[in-house]
């Protein structure tokens, strides 16, 4: 029984880890990060497959956490899909390192590792390993030079940016 509990604890802890060589941003200001973000690009995952016009809205929860509302359009089903979750800081509130849950007690990492600290207009986010990557912006389009910079940073850290899916917001 102790072995099973240990394996479970290690598994759950691993889900909120940080990929090798990735460092969450410091001087993170949640109040500036709140609001609507557009998903510009991502690595493929089942839960977003086939969706376009994807956004994430972040707002404060009564318990001090963050309400996460992800939304995307499925052309195949001709309808909007939504998922609501909750996020909490893993360490200090000034570090871009949170854990997010969309179902039950299971959390995954939400690591902001690149950010426009001045205006909070773009961010580079990953999950617990390098198969999770998102490029987010405050507008549905991003300048090419900014996109190139973010893709280069992710690539240098070992993310397979050749597999990025660029989200259609039309």
Predicted regions and their residues:
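Sec-dependent N-terminal signal peptides
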Residues: 4-13
């Amino acid at each position: 029984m102790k072995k099973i509990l240990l394996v479970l604890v290690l598994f759950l802890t691993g889900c909120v880890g940080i990929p090798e060589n990735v460092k969450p941003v410091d001087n993170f200001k949640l109040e500036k990060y709140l609001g609507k973000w557009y998903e510009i690009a991502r690595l493929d995952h089942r839960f977003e497959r086939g969706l376009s016009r994807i956004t994430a809205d972040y707002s404060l929860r009564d318990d001090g956490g963050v309400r996460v509302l992800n939304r995307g359009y499925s052309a195949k089903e001709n309808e909007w899909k939504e998922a609501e979750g909750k996020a909490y800081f893993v360490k200090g509130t000034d570090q871009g390192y949170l854990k997010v849950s969309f179902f039950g007690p299971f959390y995954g990492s939400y690591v902001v590792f690149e950010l426009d600290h001045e205006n909070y207009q773009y961010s580079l986010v990953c999950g617990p390993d390098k198969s999770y990557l998102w490029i987010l912006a405050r507008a549905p389009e991003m300048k090419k030079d900014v996109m190139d910079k973010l893709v280069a940073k992710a690539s240098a850290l070992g993310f397979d940016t050749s597999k990025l899916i660029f989200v259609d917001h039309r």
